[in-house]
């Protein structure tokens, strides 16, 4: 019984090592491709003026919604099914990116050492 458990866990560990090495390889390939696209397309970070305009518009809209909550409710009531699916997919992607960032930051899949 113990030997079966050891064989199972060793097989599981070897598969995990294989998957992690593949993930590392494809991550590096993706980073290199992204770097080449960044250089060829001439991409650049947004300017300070662009940041200011985006965040000032966001602030104005959030202030407007805070002052007139009935408009928020009317907007939510008028959402179509396709829009709801699209925004739900965006939300799932954001949660996924956040979760991956947390995993990378902790350097482990679950929890911190002191908890």
Curated annotation (Swiss-Prot):
One Gene Ontology molecular-function label: proton transmembrane transporter activity
Pfam families: ATP-synt_G
UniProt PTM comment: Phosphorylation on Ser-62 impairs ATP synthase dimerization.
Signal peptide (residue range): none
N-acetylmethionine: residues bearing it: 1
Keywords: Acetylation, ATP synthesis, CF(0), Hydrogen ion transport, Ion transport, Membrane, Mitochondrion, Phosphoprotein, Transport
Subcellular location: Mitochondrion membrane
Phosphoprotein listed as a keyword: yes
GO cellular-component term (any): proton-transporting ATP synthase complex
GO biological process: cristae formation; protein-containing complex assembly; proton motive force-driven ATP synthesis
Location, primary (coarse class): mitochondrion
Residues the record lists as Phosphoserine modifications: 3, 62
InterPro entries on file: ATP_synth_F0_gsu_mt
Function, as annotated: Mitochondrial membrane ATP synthase (F(1)F(0) ATP synthase or Complex V) produces ATP from ADP in the presence of a proton gradient across the membrane which is generated by electron transport complexes of the respiratory chain. F-type ATPases consist of two structural domains, F(1) - containing the extramembraneous catalytic core, and F(0) - containing the membrane proton channel, linked together by a central stalk and a peripheral stalk. During catalysis, ATP synthesis in the catalytic domain of F(1) is coupled via a rotary mechanism of the central stalk subunits to proton translocation.
Subunit organization: F-type ATPases have 2 components, CF(1) - the catalytic core - and CF(0) - the membrane proton channel. In yeast, the dimeric form of ATP synthase consists of 17 polypeptides: alpha, beta, gamma, delta, epsilon, 4 (B), 5 (OSCP), 6 (A), 8, 9 (C), d, E (Tim11), f, g, h, i/j and k.
Recorded family membership: Belongs to the ATPase g subunit family.
Name used for this protein in its record: ATP synthase subunit g, mitochondrial
Organism of provenance: Saccharomyces cerevisiae (strain ATCC 204508 / S288c)
Lineage per the UniProt record: Eukaryota, Fungi, Dikarya, Ascomycota, Saccharomycotina
Gene: ATP20
